[in-house]
Amino acid sequence: MASVKKLAGKVAIVTGGASGIGEVTARLFAERGARAVVIADMQPEKGGTVAESIGGRRCSYVHCDITDEQQVRSVVDWTAATYGGVDVMFCNAGTASATAQTVLDLDLAQFDRVMRVNARGTAACVKQAARKMVELGRGGAIICTASATVHHAGPNLTDYIMSKCGVLGLVRSASLQLGVHGIRVNSVSPTALATPLTATIGLRTAADVESFYGQVTSLKGVAITAEHVAEAVAFLASDEAAFVTGHDLAVDGGLQCLPFVAVAK
């Protein structure tokens, strides 16, 4: 399929862009014509390799721990100073606990870590991107990675689900508050796919994901990939979504259309 330059001229930041959904989205942003893509991540070797492969003049890696707001602010300010603006912020960095985290066995140390990254860290990213976009006065698009789990009760991963529900609340509130500045705020909610993140909860391959979710999605014969999610993000980042804000775009194969069935891991 020929590349369509729907992001031509835009400057984008992708947190968690060194691997998984973030990496694929960063590459797609560049393919769709983004003038510059900044990969903000904590994996210097992987992030640097991705940036170099996209093209050193139009893609940079910057170390960023999103739980440190000053680091987030620095990335945003550096991007604007280096590339002349910030048009798109994809708040994608996230984490999950390595254990089941049922209510009765909730490890609060892990809980705090997950909330610090997924909820607090995402809030810092939205805040700092919005600050710069308001300062520049030309609007912008902010997209956050939520999760299909926010629409269902879960048999485990309680802390993860709570954190992503927080992301959804952030997106809705931010879209209301920032609309006056021409800033759109949306989210994508994918089901699990084989990424370094889902490997921590036992979903290491596409076959693992298909086995886990295939029973509870209505769309058969298609397994979710990072490319599917990246396409959704690219749409929300583009001017084609100019009148879309406060929306959670499900990339879930129809999971929301069916009663949830707890699948044993």
UniProtKB/Swiss-Prot annotation:
Superkingdom, natural source: Eukaryota
Stated pH dependence: Optimum pH is 10.
Keyword match Nucleotide-binding: no
Residues the record marks as active site: Y160 (proton acceptor)
Name of the protein described by the UniProt record: (-)-isopiperitenol/(-)-carveol dehydrogenase, mitochondrial
Gene Ontology BP, a term: menthol biosynthetic process
Molecular function terms, GO-annotated: carveol dehydrogenase activity; isopiperitenol dehydrogenase activity; nucleotide binding
Organism this protein belongs to: Mentha piperita
Transit peptide: 1-30
UniProt binding sites for substrate: S147
Subunit: Homodimer and homotetramer.
Function description: Involved in the biosynthesis of menthol and related monoterpenes in leaves. Can use (-)-trans-carveol and, with a lower relative velocity, (-)-trans-isopiperitenol, (+)-neomenthol, (+)-neoisomenthol and (-)-cis-isopiperitenol as substrates, but not (-)-cis-carvenol, (-)-menthol, (+)-isomenthol, 7-hydroxy-limonene, (-)-isopiperitenone or (-)-carvone.
Other facts: Can use both NAD(+) or NADP(+) as cofactor.
PANTHER family referenced in this protein's UniProt entry, alphabetically: SHORT-CHAIN DEHYDROGENASE REDUCTASE (PTHR42820), SHORT-CHAIN DEHYDROGENASE REDUCTASE 3B-LIKE (PTHR42820:SF21)
Binding site for NAD(+): 13-38
Tissue distribution: Peltate glandular trichomes.
Catalytic activity: (1S,6R)-isopiperitenol + NAD(+) = (6R)-isopiperitenone + NADH + H(+); (1S,5R)-carveol + NADP(+) = (R)-carvone + NADPH + H(+)
UniProt-listed Enzyme Commission number(s): 1.1.1.223, 1.1.1.243
A cellular component annotation (GO) from this entry: mitochondrion
InterPro entries: NAD(P)-bd_dom_sf, SDR_fam
Pfam families, sorted: adh_short_C2
UniProt family annotation: Belongs to the short-chain dehydrogenases/reductases (SDR) family.
EC main group: oxidoreductase
Keywords associated with the record: Mitochondrion, NAD, NADP, Oxidoreductase, Transit peptide
Subcellular location: Mitochondrion
